[in-house]
Amino acid sequence: DLDIVQITFRFWYLLATDIHRALEQGNPAALPFRDVFEQLFAVILRHLRFPDDDTDLTGQERDDFRSFRHYMGDTLKDCCYVLGAEACLARSLEVIESALAQASPELRWQDMEAPLFSMRSMGGQVDVTTSEVVPRVFALVPRLPPHPRLRYAGLLVMSRYTEWVADHPEHLSGILTFITTGFDGSDRDIAAAAAQAMDFLCQDCREHLVPYFDQLMHFFRSVHATLAVDDLLSVSEALAHVVTAMPPAAATEALVQLAQPLLENVHEVCELPSATKPDLMRAADRMEQLA
């Protein structure tokens, strides 16, 4: 009963705080509780799993479950507090690696999406500068089966660990390619996840992405007319982050390039003999990007 599960969340938070303090003080009485939190971690992964068939869920039930998963993500952080974030991240990764190795016909996307969600939830706890697991995460995500829910979850995982890419720029090209392919299809959720990942990547790796600006602009010109408003804003902000890492003269020229496609859209609407409401809304959206 998920309603009962939620009642325990504060208990686990308080217990994790006390156990963490005791472990830091070298109290041997706290050691057995590590096993308890390892069991808790496994239970949470099971509860994070979407039902095999969620088509029978009402919209409210689906929203409630998503909200519940985010609360469960907070309890995962309690597990990190006791077991260590690196160890917890490795556990989630091993679940997916094991599933991929078996390649069973009975394997469902839900079996891999739940540990992916847990990786995303734990992102703020992991020291990406020293992690030995994060490189394995970035190697794994592009190898996931091409299911839209896994693609969506994988992009959001990448968006949580872009600080690692800043310390390992040799991986930047492959990661950038993976993120940009998230805009190729018609799935709005995947495009939104790709836009978020692009924003975080450009924010954390702005200096390394300066040589890629022409490539980024080519990509921007190819997608800006089809993106949803919020996604266009995220991608515009992403490229603006890169511009801030340029010398003043180069930044001025780059800003002109970035603004040009948006200004062209506004100009097209202004030239219409009788602009419709959607036309005016599109022009207003482009002006918001410019602001």
Q: How should these model regions be labeled?
A:
Residues 1-291:
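Karyopherin-beta/Importin-beta family HEAT-repeat alpha-solenoid scaffold
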